[in-house]
Amino acid sequence: MKLQKQVTVPKIEIDLSRIKQLSQEHGDENWEFRSWLKQYAPDDIDGLVKTLSQKYFALIDCMQCANCCRSLHVEFKKSELHAIAKTLGQSIEAFQKQSMSEGKVNPPCPMLNGKLCSIYENRPDVCRSYPHLEQPEFTSRLIGVIDNVAICPIAFNAFEELKAKLAWPRP
């Protein structure tokens, strides 16, 4: 995989309204990049994305954002659901009735207290791994990634730098 040696890295963007706006403006571009990216070996892309993810996790504090917690419908594992309900002092049935629909937790997450998760140390796997950049087979998950780019500053910045590092010939 050939990477640009001298890359002009886009300015780090953390303003959520700007990220949403830029994601909408880059919508067609992101879909074209998605197709173009598939020419690369998945393992090579996974390694590069992992590096970018770690870079932006070090630069951006999730606990100052919590946009994912305010925006997403999240599906927990049954075992996690039991632990969450217990932590909140509720039965699973009461938690489901109060906080869920169609098997997913309604936003904003009921465990969100301001911008902090009240069960952060015991948060579910889906929350712990969000925005899922370091999971294998990045190029097979690009529809979800593009959705996350509009919500998460870490995903947005990593995705924009990925375009720059790969010298994507923008349309």
Regions found by a protein language model. Give the residues of each.
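Short loop/turn segments that flank or connect secondary-structure elements
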Residues: 1-171
